[in-house]
Structure formats: structure tokens, C-alpha cells
């Protein structure tokens, strides 16, 4: 009995072993499946997190770019507005300066004409003012100003169409007209004499034109002796600088190789400017610089000679002192 049962026990043990192996296999398969699923889920989560992070970074970059663009646009707009405001302010300042200059020029012209009206009373003897009462003395101020508006038409073709003279002639005041002509001729004589002095003292080809020529030829009789030999030149249309169309005295001055016509004030200013340019060119010329260099070299030589003489004198004094000591 005992021997017959031994093989059965062995069989049972084999079965148990097989069952254990199968259980172990099942456990390993379950563990491998669970670990693989966990790894896959972790990978998916990591991928999702990376995608979300990338999206967030892209959104942040887009927002930053938009903010930078907006800031740049705002800065550009502010700069443009500031530039426009500055330009407007500069234009306003220029306009104000031009208005001030025009006002100053008008004031100077009014002052000059007032001085002329007052000066006529001092230059001319009171007896020649007979018939000029009634406001006609003020017509003298308009003679030169209305030359440009004088008409060139007429039977005689002369330039005696000044509105101031026409207003007097139309009233048929012959004493007033003759007195006015005498006053104007005497005044022109004084002006010519003064301007002749300016011409002889360095005016560069200036010439005068006093307006209308009288029919009786009184203007030619009043010409100064210095100008009788010179032919009368035509009146310029306008000043090359201030564009004024009337002046009692015109100056023709060379500027940059061209001869230009200037009124009296602009001509004097241009002459001074030409003189300054000429002096500057002479001062900075090569010959002047060479002369200055020669003078500096001579001064240096004189200083060196003086130093050598002083050294010789000191040496001689030292020798004399040594001889005395011996």
C-alpha cells in the first residue's frame, strides 16, 4: 500500500509545481501590461504638457510682439506730433519775425520821409514855399513813391505822369506847380552834391535817377559839375536785394562777377560787405601768410641772438670773477 501511494504523491507535487509556474507567469504578464500602460499614459501626459507649454510660449511671444508694435507706433506718433508742433512753432516764429521786419521797415521808411519833409523846411528859404500851403508840402513825400505807377502812354511819351504831380496840375495851380518844381530841384541839387561826395569816396559806378524830367529842362541846369560829363543811365526796374522799385539814388555794384543794381541803402551795405571780403582775402592771402611767416622767423632769430648775447655776457662775467678770485 505504501509503495503504491508514492507515485501519486509525486504526481501531485508535479501538478502543484505547474500551477505555481502558471501563476507566476500570469503575475509577470499582468505586471508587464500594467507598467507598459502606465508608461504610455505618462508619455501622453508629458506630450500634452509640452504642447500646452509651447502654446503658452507662443501666446506670450505674440502678446509681447503686439505690445512692442503698439509701443513703437505710439512713440512714432508722438514723435511725428512733436515734429509737427515744432515745425508749426518755427513757421509761426518765422511769420512773426517777417511781420516784425516788415513793420520795422515801414517804420524806418516813414521816419525817413518825415525827416525829409522836416529837412526841406531847413534847407529851402521860406520865401520859396509861397503857394505850397494847403497840404501840398506833403505831396513831396509821394513823388518818389509814385514813380513806379507813372504811365508811359501820352503824346509826349515823357515820364511826367506821377500821380502827385497830376493831382496838382489838375487843380490848375500854376504858382504852386512852379514852386513845387523849384523846391524839388533845389532838394535834388543838395542830394546830388552829397551823393557825389560818396561817389568820389569809393562808390563803385553808382548813378542817380531823380524821377521825372521837367519840360523846361530845369533838372539838367541843376546837375552838379561833377556829373555833367557822365551820360544819364536808365532807371533799374527794382533793387536786386530788397526788390524796391523806387529810389532817389541807384548803385551798380559787381557781385560774384555780375553787375547788379541796388538802391542807395542796399548799395552801401553791399559795398561795405565787398570791402570786408576784400580785406579778408588780402589778410588770408598766400603772400600775406608768407610775410607773416617771415616776420615770425625774423623775430625768432632776433630772440635767439639776444639769448646768445646774454649767455656770452654771463660767461664773460664768470671768467672775470674767476680771474679776480685767483
From Swiss-Prot:
Gene this protein is translated from: gtaU
One Gene Ontology term from the biological process aspect of the record: regulation of DNA-templated transcription
Record InterPro entries: Znf_GATA, Znf_NHR/GATA
Species the sequence originates in: Dictyostelium discoideum (Social amoeba)
Metal-binding listed as a keyword: yes
Gene Ontology MF terms: sequence-specific DNA binding; zinc ion binding
Assigned keywords, A-Z: Metal-binding, Zinc, Zinc-finger
Region entry Disordered, spans: 1-102, 145-238, 277-326
Signal peptide annotation: none
Full protein name: GATA zinc finger domain-containing protein 21
Annotated Low complexity bias: 17-102, 148-164
Amino acid at each position: 500500500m505504501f509503495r503504491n501511494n508514492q507515485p501519486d504523491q509525486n504526481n501531485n507535487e508535479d501538478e502543484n509545481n505547474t500551477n505555481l509556474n502558471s501563476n507566476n507567469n500570469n503575475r509577470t504578464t499582468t505586471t508587464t501590461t500594467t507598467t507598459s500602460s502606465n508608461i504610455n499614459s505618462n508619455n501622453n501626459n508629458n506630450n500634452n504638457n509640452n504642447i500646452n507649454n509651447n502654446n503658452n510660449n507662443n501666446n506670450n511671444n505674440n502678446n509681447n510682439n503686439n505690445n512692442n508694435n503698439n509701443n513703437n507706433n505710439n512713440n512714432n506718433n508722438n514723435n511725428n506730433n512733436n515734429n509737427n508742433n515744432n515745425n508749426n512753432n518755427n513757421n509761426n516764429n518765422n511769420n512773426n519775425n517777417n511781420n516784425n521786419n516788415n513793420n520795422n521797415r515801414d517804420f524806418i521808411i516813414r521816419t525817413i520821409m518825415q525827416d525829409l519833409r522836416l529837412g526841406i523846411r531847413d534847407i529851402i528859404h521860406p520865401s520859396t514855399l509861397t503857394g505850397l500851403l494847403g497840404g501840398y508840402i506833403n505831396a513831396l513825400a509821394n513823388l518818389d513813391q509814385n514813380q513806379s505807377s507813372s504811365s508811359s502812354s501820352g503824346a509826349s511819351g515823357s515820364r511826367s505822369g506821377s500821380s502827385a504831380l497830376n493831382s496838382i496840375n489838375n487843380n490848375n495851380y500854376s504858382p504852386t506847380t512852379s514852386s513845387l518844381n523849384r523846391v524839388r530841384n533845389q532838394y535834388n541839387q543838395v542830394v546830388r552834391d552829397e551823393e557825389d561826395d560818396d561817389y568820389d569816396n569809393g562808390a563803385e559806378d553808382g548813378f542817380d535817377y531823380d524821377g521825372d524830367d521837367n519840360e523846361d529842362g530845369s533838372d539838367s541846369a541843376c546837375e552838379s559839375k561833377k556829373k555833367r560829363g557822365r551820360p544819364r543811365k536808365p532807371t533799374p526796374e527794382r533793387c536786386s536785394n530788397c526788390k524796391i522799385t523806387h529810389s532817389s539814388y541807384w548803385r551798380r555794384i559787381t557781385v560774384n562777377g555780375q553787375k547788379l543794381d541796388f538802391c542807395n541803402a542796399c548799395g552801401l551795405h553791399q559795398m561795405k560787405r565787398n570791402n570786408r571780403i576784400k580785406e579778408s582775402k588780402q589778410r588770408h592771402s598766400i603772400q600775406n601768410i608768407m610775410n607773416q611767416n617771415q616776420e615770425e622767423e625774423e623775430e625768432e632769430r632776433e630772440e635767439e641772438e639776444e639769448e646768445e648775447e646774454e649767455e656770452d655776457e654771463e660767461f664773460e662775467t664768470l671768467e672775470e670773477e674767476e680771474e679776480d678770485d685767483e
